[in-house]
């Protein structure tokens, strides 16, 4: 049988122009996809933080009720040495990034019963008076900057280089937060990505955030987040 030589074009590769077109298309897709992925990661970190604060507050309240004990819920201010301008030995240079609940013994000594929960690396609690009444001037009498021998050491090299603000769950499930006063009974925290701190003002959070609010009388809490249903 006669045979035919294979077509030369069958083994021809891509031309330089074709390769450049492919590279350009990949670049365009990358430009579109990277911001979207970044936004998804930020949203995921905030969702994780919302679940953490809600779950731990519920556990602390349940512990107070079931054990008939006073439980202190602390918000820790710590510095991250990997962040520019922050010094691990100076908590004043850091942000509120962790929380924990402790049983208060009859002698007033705190006994850690809840684990120390650290927020995802990119998430912080905004320290503004108006965005976080639990951390601002209204909570000045519950802010501790001098750590004592009875206070626990924090992990990850923090030790006792931290400050904290706290409130308490009472044995009946209520809190020691005032239902009136300067906050009109509105006690809350605003969480957002650290990188968005410059997008926030004293009165306005950045575009991507959530607010955790606690009822001073019932001790129950809920999450408020733009575009999402209220989570209790």
Protein language model regions, located:
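Internal alpha-helical transmembrane segments of multi-pass membrane proteins, especially GPCRs
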Residues: 12, 18-21
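N-terminal helix-rich module
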Residues: 2-7, 11-14, 32-62, 66, ...
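Alpha-helical hydrophobic helix detector
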Residues: 20-36
